[in-house]
């Protein structure tokens, strides 16, 4: 009697999530300044909450930048920590869009071993100035009727003919090697609508003609159908290229300078090169070939700059090619770096006199609750009502940044318990595990003798005879130079005096 055996094979499928480049950052939820058409700030719009007067002032700056006629102005955003100074600058950047150059720079980035301070600031200034270069090109635009390519037996020189048409006319063009390679690379077939730049020979595939929409053919979802062009085949078209002054500097600073744009190894650029470029750009502007677009340079933590950098900014603001400089600081009356003088916001008085100041104020409890709710939505975390209330209280007593950081930590604690909603206990657990700045300072003061001080000394506890731990001042020196004792001279060298 035969026995049938059934074998079951278990197949395990592993799915790997590929993380994209759009990670959640501190200000990724901000998409603008949250203003209406009359520059009136909304209470909660485009990720911005509160700071109504500061956002309205930033809206005025936005209109100045969009007008493109005013440059060389300095704006200072000053306020306590965690009051949204950087958020206002990011909202301004989002509102300007991609057409206006916006360069964000931390003041500590200026200090480098590869570049001098003035060179780093000069490059940042010139990155914030855009040049719109207008160029008229002749293009051939039409629908491909037929492509005929003749190859020799030896496989050498290729020849071909391209039949192209519009709704009004049809023409046959002779093709050379370069054009045949371009058509093959773009995978141009009969029925495609293409555009050919006569000067450079660049071929652009615009789409597929509507007349071929019903053809039996395999097409991908990205296939775009367009109308067959009308009128003449050869047309003149104005093309606008947008480039920054810094990119022009790098390209002209050395042979194959355009490669340095991708590697980032620009190095020091000679002033003579920049002067020649400024002269040429001024000529293009007078001839109507180019248009200067003053952008925005944002310097965060500006109090970290020293007196030489502030002096350079004073001079650079008076230059012809100068952007609008926005600075942010959270310092009060503090010492100017590089000097022994104290000044408001750690900046020299002459630069403060040139700047218009926007002040930010601390957030209220309702505003903190709204911001934390927006952050939770951005991070895809579901908070219970009690958890949001506790986070709001923590944000009031500590800082908004600390409360926002607890959101993702609390989510991991909740997921460990297989809960999709973060509740009150998860927030408490995260609060006990991770200290805020005040509790960290308190712990440090209570246990200061167990940490190494400025002189490399540390007190280590030693167990006494009765079992208790008694602190013993055992000093461990960390690379401390020993004081040199004067050596005793030999008896013969001593001089006796009567």
Swiss-Prot record:
One of its GO terms (cellular component) is R2TP complex. ATP binds at residues 79-86. One of its GO terms (molecular function) is ATP binding. InterPro entries: AAA+_ATPase, P-loop_NTPase, RuvB-like, RuvB-like_C, RuvBL1/2_DNA/RNA_bd_dom, TIP49_P-loop. Pfam families: TIP49 (PF06068), TIP49_C (PF17856). It catalyses: ATP + H2O = ADP + phosphate + H(+). The keyword Transcription applies. Residues 458-498 are annotated as: Disordered. Residues 461-489 have a biased composition (Polar residues). The keyword Transcription regulation applies. GO terms for biological process: box C/D snoRNP assembly; chromatin remodeling; DNA repair; regulation of transcription by RNA polymerase II; rRNA processing. SUPFAM superfamilies: P-loop containing nucleoside triphosphate hydrolases (SSF52540). Its EC number is 3.6.4.12. It is found in: Nucleus. Keywords: Activator, ATP-binding, Chromatin regulator, DNA damage, DNA repair, Helicase, Hydrolase, Nucleotide-binding, Nucleus, rRNA processing, Transcription, Transcription regulation. Signal peptide: none annotated. It is an enzyme of class 3 (hydrolase). May form heterododecamers with RVB1. Component of the SWR1 chromatin remodeling complex, the INO80 chromatin remodeling complex, and of the R2TP complex. DNA helicase which participates in several chromatin remodeling complexes, including the SWR1 and the INO80 complexes. The SWR1 complex mediates the ATP-dependent exchange of histone H2A for the H2A variant HZT1 leading to transcriptional regulation of selected genes by chromatin remodeling. The INO80 complex remodels chromatin by shifting nucleosomes and is involved in DNA repair. Also involved in pre-rRNA processing. PANTHER family: RUVB-RELATED REPTIN AND PONTIN (PTHR11093). This is RuvB-like helicase 2. The gene is RVB2.
């Amino acid at each position: 009697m035969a026995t049938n055996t059934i074998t079951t094979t278990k197949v395990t499928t592993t799915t790997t999530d590929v993380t994209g480049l759009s990670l959640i950052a501190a200000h990724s939820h901000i998409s603008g300044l949250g203003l209406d058409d009359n520059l009136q700030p909304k209470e909660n719009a485009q990720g911005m909450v509160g700071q109504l007067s500061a956002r309205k002032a930033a809206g005025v700056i936005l209109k100045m930048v969009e007008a493109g006629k005013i440059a060389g102005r300095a704006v200072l955003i000053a306020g306590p920590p965690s009051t949204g100074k950087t958020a206002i600058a990011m909202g301004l950047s989002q509102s300007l869009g991609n057409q206006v150059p916006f360069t964000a720079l931390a003041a500590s980035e200026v200090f480098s071993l590869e570049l001098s301070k003035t060179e780093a600031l000069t490059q940042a200034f010139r990155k914030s100035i855009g040049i719109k270069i207008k160029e008229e090109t002749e293009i051939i635009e039409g629908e491909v009727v037929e492509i005929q390519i003749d190859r020799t037996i030896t496989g050498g020189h290729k020849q071909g003919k391209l039949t192209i048409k519009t709704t009004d006319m049809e023409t046959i063009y002779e093709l050379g090697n370069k054009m045949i390679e371009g058509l093959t690379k773009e995978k141009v077939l009969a029925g495609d609508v293409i555009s050919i730049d006569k000067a450079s020979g660049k071929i652009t595939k615009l789409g597929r003609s509507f007349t071929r929409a019903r053809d039996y053919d395999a097409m991908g979802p990205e296939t775009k159908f367009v109308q067959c062009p009308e009128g003449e085949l050869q047309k003149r078209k104005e093309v606008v290229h947008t480039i920054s002054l810094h990119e022009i500097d790098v390209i002209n600073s050395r042979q194959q300078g355009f490669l340095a744009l991708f590697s980032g190894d620009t190095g020091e650029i000679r002033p003579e090169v920049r002067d020649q470029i400024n002269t040429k750009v001024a000529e293009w502007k007078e001839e109507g070939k180019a248009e200067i677009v003053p952008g925005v340079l944002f310097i965060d933590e500006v109090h970290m700059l020293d007196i030489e950098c502030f002096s350079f900014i004073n001079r650079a603001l008076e230059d012809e090619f100068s952007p609008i400089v926005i600075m942010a600081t959270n310092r009060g009356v503090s010492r100017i770096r590089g000097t022994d003088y104290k000044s408001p916001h750690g900046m020299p008085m002459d630069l403060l006199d040139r700047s218009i100041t926007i002040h930010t104020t601390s957030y209220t409890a309702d505003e903190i609750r709204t911001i934390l709710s927006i952050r939770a939505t951005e991070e895809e975390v579901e908070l219970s009502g009690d958890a949001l209330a506790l986070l709001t209280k923590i944000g009031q007593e500590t800082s908004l940044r600390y409360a926002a950081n607890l959101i993702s930590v609390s989510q991991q604690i909740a997921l460990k318990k297989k809960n999709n909603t973060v509740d009150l206990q998860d927030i408490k657990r995260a609060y006990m595990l991770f200290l805020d700045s005040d509790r960290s300072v308190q712990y440090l003061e209570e246990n200061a003798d167990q940490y190494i001080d400025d002189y490399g000394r540390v007190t280590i506890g030693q167990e006494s005879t009765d079992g208790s731990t008694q602190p013993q001042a055992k000093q461990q020196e960390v690379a401390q130079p020993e004081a040199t004792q004067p050596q005793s001279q030999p008896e013969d060298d001593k001089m006796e005096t009567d």
